[in-house]
Amino acid sequence: MSDNDELQQIAHLRREYTKGGLRRRDLPAEPLTLFERWLSQACDAKLADPTAMVVATVDEHGQPYQRIVLLKHYDEKGMVFYTNLGSRKAHQIENNPRVSLLFPWHTLERQVMVIGKAERLSTLEVMKYFHSRPRDSQIGAWVSKQSSRISARGILESKFLELKQKFQQGEVPLPSFWGGFRVSLEQIEFWQGGEHRLHDRFLYQRENDAWKIDRLAP
């Protein structure tokens, strides 16, 4: 069998989804109620990084980019993550705040997609979270000029040790280039895998002060 033949075998990789369906009658009026339930179940199932989510942005040319970050807070105002403000994603958000989030809970045969606008968090919110992080993580935030090219990992490690020595006394200050974003909740889609590829998809879409719920074809 040639290498090409082996690669083509991926076309046959599939399985049935058997974890159960999602029915309209079981949906709460508020999407965050269902999100909280699903997130809790993802945590109870001991999934690796259940709060990991894909953040999709686009640059000024319309080129999409994706990366995984961790959800750090959520409420009716939106979903929060933190990042280096000099990063590619931060620059792209400043240029175009419309983003999409995706929670890929494969083991539970579920995914949740969020569409909304990202806005910068206040310095007070950022500082409160920053000082709740492990000390080494705080120092790590100072080390990297995110998305810039570097010649070797050793540069980062040396910088970390240098800053660890510098900040050994007292609190680690909040870097001016480190912050967070809150993504508003305009649309939230819940996907549950189904047998015979008849998946269940429900879209919550905000209309004024209420949520409209539609079932989508798989």
Swiss-Prot record:
Domain of life, source organism: Bacteria
InterPro entries tied to this protein: Pyridox_Oxase, Pyridox_Oxase_CS, Pyridox_Oxase_N, Pyridoxamine_oxidase_dimer_C, Split_barrel_FMN-bd
SUPFAM superfamilies referenced in this protein's UniProt entry, alphabetically: FMN-binding split barrel
Pathway it works in: Cofactor metabolism; pyridoxal 5'-phosphate salvage; pyridoxal 5'-phosphate from pyridoxamine 5'-phosphate: step 1/1; Cofactor metabolism; pyridoxal 5'-phosphate salvage; pyridoxal 5'-phosphate from pyridoxine 5'-phosphate: step 1/1
UniProt-listed Enzyme Commission number(s): 1.4.3.5
GO biological processes: pyridoxine biosynthetic process
UniProt remark on cofactor binding: Binds 1 FMN per subunit.
Binding-site list for substrate: 14-17, 72, 129, 133, 137, 197-199
Keyword Flavoprotein: yes
PANTHER family given in the database record: PYRIDOXINE-5'-PHOSPHATE OXIDASE, PYRIDOXINE-5-PHOSPHATE OXIDASE
Family: Belongs to the pyridoxamine 5'-phosphate oxidase family.
NCBIfam families, alphabetized: pdxH (TIGR00558), PRK05679.1 (NF004231)
Name this protein carries in UniProt: Pyridoxine/pyridoxamine 5'-phosphate oxidase
Gene name per UniProt: pdxH
